UniProtKB/Swiss-Prot annotation:
The lineage of its organism: Eukaryota, Metazoa, Chordata, Craniata, Vertebrata. The modification Phosphoserine is found at residues 50, 146. It comes from the Eukaryota. The gene is KIAA1143. The modification N6-acetyllysine is found at residue 108. PANTHER family: GEO02494P1 (PTHR31195:SF2). This is Uncharacterized protein KIAA1143. Residues 23-63, 79-154 are annotated as: Disordered. Keywords: Acetylation, Phosphoprotein. Residues 43-56 have a biased composition (Acidic residues). It holds the Pfam family DUF4604.
Amino acid sequence: MSKRNQVSYVRPAEPAFLARFKERVGYREGPTVETKRIQPQPPDEDGDHSDKEDEQPQVVVLKKGDLSVEEVMKIKAEIKAAKADEEPTPADGRIIYRKPVKHPSDEKYSGLTASSKKKKPNEDEVNQDSVKKNSQKQIKNSSLLSFDNEDENE
């Protein structure tokens, strides 16, 4: 049994004609188990992937107020600097959660204007409906069979 555990696969050497053919064609070897185990490098931390000069959008200035290429580059630099100042990444790589900043209640409702006129009639209607239902139940109850003394005598 112990000899079975010692069995391993040895890859034979590639023939010379295959090596020459692959070299002429430009064949690249696919990933192997060993290459898949290697940890890939993390991508750049910048989320802006269009930093290359040939991948930048074409800037066209039609009017006086339009942005020029230099102004766009300045704005991008300012945005990157602001992002760098806002959230420094922790050295150990852990994510830190923070509670959101609470705003005063005045700011919260400053833009909202709602009237309760629609709500009040609805509440009144609900109350009136419940009164009507109660009166209907009383009417139905009175029309039900009743066992009076007269019925008992017969």
